[in-house]
Amino acid sequence: MQVVYRRCGGLDVHKDTITATVLVFGEEGQRDVRKKEFGTHWKELQRLGQWLRSSKVERVAMESTGVYWKPVWNVLERTLPMILANPYQVKNIPSQKTDRRDSEWIADLLAHDLIRPSFVPPPEIRRMRELTRYRVQLTGERNRVHNRIHKVLEDANLKLDTVLSDLLGVSGRAMLYAIVKGQCDPGWLADYARGSLRAKREQLELVLRGDIQDHHRYLLGELLADLEFVESKILRLDQELLRRMEPYQDSVERLCTIPGVDVLTAWTLIAELGADVSAFPDAAHAASWAGLCPSNCESAGKRLSCRTKKGNRWLRRALCQSAWAVTHKKDCYLTALFYRRAAQHGTKKAIIATAHQLLIIAYHLLRDRTVYRELGGNFYDQLHPQRTQNRLIRRLERLGLQITIRPQLAHAEPPLTKRPRGRPCKCSERGIACKHRRL
């Protein structure tokens, strides 16, 4: 096999040790293998970089082993051309496995250009990626606290969630804090209702009559304190993300023009894909990297599976949430796409297809520096009007109806509305054409 890089390095990274191999190929094909072990603290990483530079390597490859690869990458990427490999794609031939053999195997694959580089964004994007992922974890913790509060209330036979649409809204929290302070009279607790909830006072008094014990009050107090703590952390994190996203505010605004995409989803897209999507040749490569396209499993001319491949679960999660939000939009191309796919393949596959389309749109907006252009909910009907007409006729004929097609007559303009004399209209103030007439 042809040697592409004559001087290359391979690293087998662990928590406390790094096994490095430098592979040098001579003009006549001879191999010179040099191996050395290093630690993982700062001075050892500096010594590793100096040893690799003194060996004059052209490329250095390493596996993405948990979080252990990140400190090594952060130090070496400043002075050496690095390649991050997916461990699943660089598995060694089954044999006696050792760290020294693994590092040599990685170097050998790199020398023959058999390693597909993983996408590693610039340092600033990586920092924002850690913040957006941490926010997802905090949101999950907040939801877990919500569930624990529901459990305590059910144990105390307080069915508040059957009346309140948001148990932890303004009214719900006021009632919970009053319960923690010792209030248990349903009439007094119902007085904390705000807004339209006041009209449900009788129902509130009914569901607030339960069996509240001292340990319930203690648990509610602790859980409400936990909830306030987590929400304060989310608020501070949002402020930090807002500060770091200022250089990319133009990209955030472009992404927010897509139906179903809010600011948090736009932050996630930029943190996972990067504001510069040139690392992906086209939108199909980006969708494959995110795990939002069918896998390619074929044998003997038959497709064995079409399940989506593994990809970036953080990006996939954000896009699927946006896809669910799109389903509630009206007169929207993405909504029409979802219901079209849902009728053919089911809801879950339709959500993946909609998320795939969202990623394609986001890719083009970031690459072309443009905004979203709505195609309308009738896009597919107008794409093939004759096909749509024939399909609807067949459906009506199956119901026993006889259909006659006639061209639609032009709509006549609506008559002018009559207004009492002496009371002028406000069309001119609103800047619209006046169609009123005075009697």
Q: Where do the model's predicted regions map?
A:
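A detector of single, family-specific signature residues
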Residues: M1-L439
